[in-house]
Amino acid sequence: MNLSCSLVLLGGGKGERFNSLQPKQYTHLCGEPLILHALHAYQRLPFVQEVVVVCEEQYRELFLPYSVKFASPGTLRQDSVFSGLQQVSTPWVCIHDGVRPFVYADEVIEVCSAARKTGAAALASPATYTIKSCAPVRTLDRDALAVIHTPQCLDTEVLREGLLLARAMDFSLSDDTEAAELLGIEPTLVFSNRVQIKVTYPEDLLFAETLLSKSSTYK
């Protein structure tokens, strides 16, 4: 199966909850900015044809040693994704958050393969916590729920049409594959049994450092 695709790497978030002077994706993890951990992992994948980094101009110098395109971030995450999509030249696109430093080749391959069958796919983990809705308060069946991560892979035109529809509806998307859902496409979920870290708080960075420094599994 031909898995050729583009990568849109999101690096435009402000990260207010991280309590840092710089956006969390540029905070160092074991001597290297978080976002570069993800970039290096994707650049080792031969089927990734191009990389589009969505970031503020002041951070572009960090990526100059690499063969990447640039796009400017928007107000919402979906605006940033749409901005990056304008630089994509392949029929398939993979989206990855710059604050998710751990990327596993087998999972990217599985997500991209699954997307070819339905038009959209996302990496997921089973819900392990008890989750309640707030209004009204009631317990949800966690066996019917999943926690969604990146990578997420979509048909480029499906994503474009879904993002445009969301904009026309003034609808805020929770993730990228929800753009496909708006078009009536049911995304495929690829379940992972690994720890999936999204660095949101300073404690997340400490956890990531521990994993990266002490376990060869995450290197």
From Swiss-Prot:
Keywords: Isoprene biosynthesis, Nucleotidyltransferase, Transferase. The keyword DNA damage does not apply. Gene3D superfamilies: Spore Coat Polysaccharide Biosynthesis Protein SpsA, Chain A (3.90.550.10). The record marks R17, K24 as: Transition state stabilizer. GO terms for biological process: isopentenyl diphosphate biosynthetic process, methylerythritol 4-phosphate pathway. Pathway: Isoprenoid biosynthesis; isopentenyl diphosphate biosynthesis via DXP pathway; isopentenyl diphosphate from 1-deoxy-D-xylulose 5-phosphate: step 2/6. SUPFAM superfamilies: Nucleotide-diphospho-sugar transferases (SSF53448). The record marks R142, K198 as: Positions MEP for the nucleophilic attack. It comes from the Bacteria. One of its GO terms (molecular function) is 2-C-methyl-D-erythritol 4-phosphate cytidylyltransferase activity. Its EC number is 2.7.7.60. Belongs to the IspD/TarI cytidylyltransferase family. IspD subfamily. Catalyzes the formation of 4-diphosphocytidyl-2-C-methyl-D-erythritol from CTP and 2-C-methyl-D-erythritol 4-phosphate (MEP). PANTHER family: 2-C-METHYL-D-ERYTHRITOL 4-PHOSPHATE CYTIDYLYLTRANSFERASE, CHLOROPLASTIC. This is 2-C-methyl-D-erythritol 4-phosphate cytidylyltransferase. It comes from Chlamydia trachomatis serovar D (strain ATCC VR-885 / DSM 19411 / UW-3/Cx). The lineage of its organism: Bacteria, Pseudomonadati, Chlamydiota, Chlamydiia, Chlamydiales. The gene is ispD.
